[in-house]
C-alpha cells in the first residue's frame, strides 16, 4: 500500500512538472518573424505570472481585431523602465511582436513605441540595470 501511495505521488509530481514546462513553452510562437503594427490600447494587465497587452489593430482586410501580447511579469518590466501606467486604454501605440504560428492575432511582445516616442521593451540591459519606481 505504501508503494502504491508513493507511486501515485510520483506520477502526480511528473504530471505537474510537464504542465509547468508546457506553460513556458514558446512552441506556438514564430521565433523567426517579427511584426510591427499600430493600434489602440484596449487593456494593459500588469500581473503575475505574465503581463498582457490587448491592442485593437486594423488588419489587412480593413477589419479591426484584438491582438493579445504576452509580456514578462511586472518585476522584469519595472527593470526595463515600465510603470503600471506606462500605457493606458485609448493610447495610440506602435508595437513589435513575435506572432503566433497559427495566424491568430497576437503573440509574444517585443517592444512598444509610446505616443511621446519613448520605446519600451520587456528586458532591462544586462549590466548596470537601473531600478525604477513603480508609481
Segments the model singles out, each with a brief description of its role:
Residues 7-19:
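Bacterial N-terminal signal peptides
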Residues 20-35:
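Short boundary/loop segments of OB/S1/cold-shock single-stranded nucleic-acid-binding domains
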Residues 37-41:
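Conserved hydrophobic positions within beta-strands
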Residues 47-57:
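Short aromatic-glycine-enriched beta-strand elements
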Residues 71-79:
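Short, structured beta-strand/loop micro-motifs enriched in basic residues and often containing a Trp
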Residues 79-94:
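Short nucleic-acid-contacting surface segments enriched for D/E, G, S/T with interspersed K/R
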Residues 100-123:
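OB-fold/S1-family single-stranded nucleic acid-binding modules
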Residues 118-135:
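Extended, charge-rich, solvent-exposed interface segments
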